[in-house]
C-alpha cells in the first residue's frame, strides 16, 4: 500500500491522535484517567490500519485491538490497556518539550569547536559514500534513487538496533516512495520524517553532537553508515538555498552552572566563535520556547542556512526552524532574570567559510 506525506488522510496526524491509558491500574474507576501519547510514527501506523479497517495495528511492543479498543502486549495477552482515538484541531496538539530544550550538543561539551560551515559528520558521510563536494544529489539527480535506498536501509538497521523495527519500516517505506522523485520532494519527505517524534531525529542528533569529543569519536563514526545517507539527504536542502538574515530564534535548555559559566566566558572573548554540529530545532515563538528549562537562548541570525519546517511539520504551532549543522555562533550577552528565575543567553548566528 502506498504511503504518502501528510497531504493524504492516512498520514495526516494534525487532527487525529491515538492515546493509551497510563494509570498504574488502567482499570481503576476511582482514579482520574491519565492518558499518554503514542509516538508520531506509532500514530501513523495505528491510524493507517484503522482507516484500512484492519482488525489490529501491530507496533514494536504492542498491538492495538480496534474491536475492543485495547493495547495488548505482544508477548502477554493479559497485559492490556484501554486506548482511544482523539480528533482535535491542530492547535490543540501537545508541545514537545524535549525537542526544543535538549542541548544542541553534548552536555559535557556544551558547544562544538569551530569546524567551518560543513559538519565533519557530513564530510565523513560523503567520504564513506565516495561523493565529491560537487556531486551532491541536488546537483546530480541520478544519485537520488541509490541514496534514498541506502537511507531507507540505514533507518531500518538503526530501528532494529533500538527495538523499533516497525517504526523504522514505516519511515523507510515513506522515503522509498520518493526515490524516483526530484530532490525537492525527497528533501520534503526527509524534513517531514525528521520533524516527527521518533528515534530517527534523536539518534541522528545524538551521534552528531559527539563530533569534536575525542573520547566519543568511534561512537559517532559508527553511525555514518546507517544514519549518514539520511543525514546527507536532509543536509542537501535544495529549497532553502539562500542564507536567512535579520530574524530571531529561541530555544530553551536546562543548563548546569558550569555550562552557563562557559557561555559567560565567551562573552569576554568576542572574537571566539563555536559551531553547532547537529541539526538544531528552534522556534520563532519566544513564548513557547520560554516554557521549558532554566535557560533561554535568544539567537539573532546574521546570515545562516536555516530551514522553515513549520509547513511540513505535524506541529505547525511550534514554528520550528531547523539550524543546519556547522552554523557558527558568538555569545553576545548572558543575563539572569530574577523574576523568571531564568538565564537569557544571547547568541549571534552566522555562516563561516573557514
State where each predicted segment sits.
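Conserved mixed alpha/beta core segments that line enzyme active sites in large multi-domain catalysts
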Residues: 314-316
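Short coil-to-beta-strand transition motifs
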Residues: 319-330
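Short solvent-exposed strand/turn elements
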Residues: 339-354
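Internal glycine-rich, Lys/Arg-flanked active-site/core loops of soluble domains
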Residues: 149-312
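Eukaryote-biased intrinsically disordered, low-complexity acidic regions enriched in Ser/Thr/Pro
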Residues: 2-160
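Structural signal for hydrophobic/aromatic residues that build the beta-strand cores
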Residues: 18, 69-72, 250, 285, ...
Amino acid at each position: 500500500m502506498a504511503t504518502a506525506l501528510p497531504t493524504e488522510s492516512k498520514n495526516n496526524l494534525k487532527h487525529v491522535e491515538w492515546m493509551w491509558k497510563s494509570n498504574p491500574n488502567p482499570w481503576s474507576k476511582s482514579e482520574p484517567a491519565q492518558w499518554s501519547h503514542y509516538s508520531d510514527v506509532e500514530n501513523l501506523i495505528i491510524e493507517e490500519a484503522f482507516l484500512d479497517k484492519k482488525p489490529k495495528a501491530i507496533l514494536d511492543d504492542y498491538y492495538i485491538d480496534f474491536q475492543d479498543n485495547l493495547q495488548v502486549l505482544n508477548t502477554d495477552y493479559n497485559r492490556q490497556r484501554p486506548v482511544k482515538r482523539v480528533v482535535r484541531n491542530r492547535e490543540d496538539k501537545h508541545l514537545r518539550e524535549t525537542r526544543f530544550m535538549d542541548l544542541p550538543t553534548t552536555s559535557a561539551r556544551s558547544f562544538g569547536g569551530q569546524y567551518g560551515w560543513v559538519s565533519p559528520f557530513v564530510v565523513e558521510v560523503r567520504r564513506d559514500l565516495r561523493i565529491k563536494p560537487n556531486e551532491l544529489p541536488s546537483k546530480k539527480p541520478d544519485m537520488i534513487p541509490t541514496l534514498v535506498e541506502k537511507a531507507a536501509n540505514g533507518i531500518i538497521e538503526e530501528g532494529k538496533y533500538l527495538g523499533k523495527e516497525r517504526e523504522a519500516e514505516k519511515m523507510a517505506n515513506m522515503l522509498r516512495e520518493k526515490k524516483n522523485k526530484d530532490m525537492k520532494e525527497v528533501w520534503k519527505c526527509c524534513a517531514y520524517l525528521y520533524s516527527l517524534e521518533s528515534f530517527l531525529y534523536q539518534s541522528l542528533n545524538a551521534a552528531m553532537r559527539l563530533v569534536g569529543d575525542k573520547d566519543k569519536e568511534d561512537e559517532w563514526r559508527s553511525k555514518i553508515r546507517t544514519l549518514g545517507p539520511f543525514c546527507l539527504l536532509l543536509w542537501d536542502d535544495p529549497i532553502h538555498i539562500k542564507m536567512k538574515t535579520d530574524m530571531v530564534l529561541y530555544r530553551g535548555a536546562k543548563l548546569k552552572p558550569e555550562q552557563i559559566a562557559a557561555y559567560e566566558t565567551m562573552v569576554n572573548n568576542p572574537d571566539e566563535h563555536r559551531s553547532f554540529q547537529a541539526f538544531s530545532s528552534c522556534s520563532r515563538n519566544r513564548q513557547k520556547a520560554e516554557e521549558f528549562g532554566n535557560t533561554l537562548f535568544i539567537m539573532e541570525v546574521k546570515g545562516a542556512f536555516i530551514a522553515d519546517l513549520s509547513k511540513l511539520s505535524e506541529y505547525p504551532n511550534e514554528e520550528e526552524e531547523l539550524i543546519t549543522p556547522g552554523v557558527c555562533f558568538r555569545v553576545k550577552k548572558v543575563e539572569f532574570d530574577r523574576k523568571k528565575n531564568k538565564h537569557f543567553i544571547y547568541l549571534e548566528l552566522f555562516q563561516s567559510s573557514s
